[in-house]
From Swiss-Prot:
HAMAP family: UPF0270. It comes from Serratia proteamaculans (strain 568). Belongs to the UPF0270 family. The lineage of its organism: Bacteria, Pseudomonadati, Pseudomonadota, Gammaproteobacteria, Enterobacterales. Gene3D superfamilies: YehU-like. NCBIfam families: PRK04966.1. Signal peptide: none annotated. This is UPF0270 protein Spro_4577. InterPro entries: UPF0270, YehU-like_sf. It holds the Pfam family UPF0270.
Length: 77
């Protein structure tokens, strides 16, 4: 289920994004990026519609995933 991120309190959204960024541990290449930079990257992707905030009823977790990946998962159900 897609969570309408614009309806969340700012602090709640920030916490969700930070949790996601810390969980992902993505390698950014030669230049390490700060937590703040990574959070802003994810926030920009949410605003642009590139990624979605998604609730998994099966796992009872919230995740951030690319829009295309969410749609592909829906087609498999």
């Amino acid at each position: 289920m897609i969570i309408p991120w614009k309806e969340l309190e700012t602090e709640t959204l920030n916490s969700l994004i930070e949790s996601f960024v810390l969980r992902e541990g993505t390698d950014y290449g030669e230049h390490e990026r700060s937590l703040e930079q990574k959070v802003e990257d994810v926030r920009r992707q949410l605003k642009n519609g590139e990624v979605l905030l998604v609730w998994s009823e099966l796992h009872e977790t919230i995740n951030i995933m690319p829009r295309g990946q969410f749609r592909a998962g829906q087609e498999e159900i």
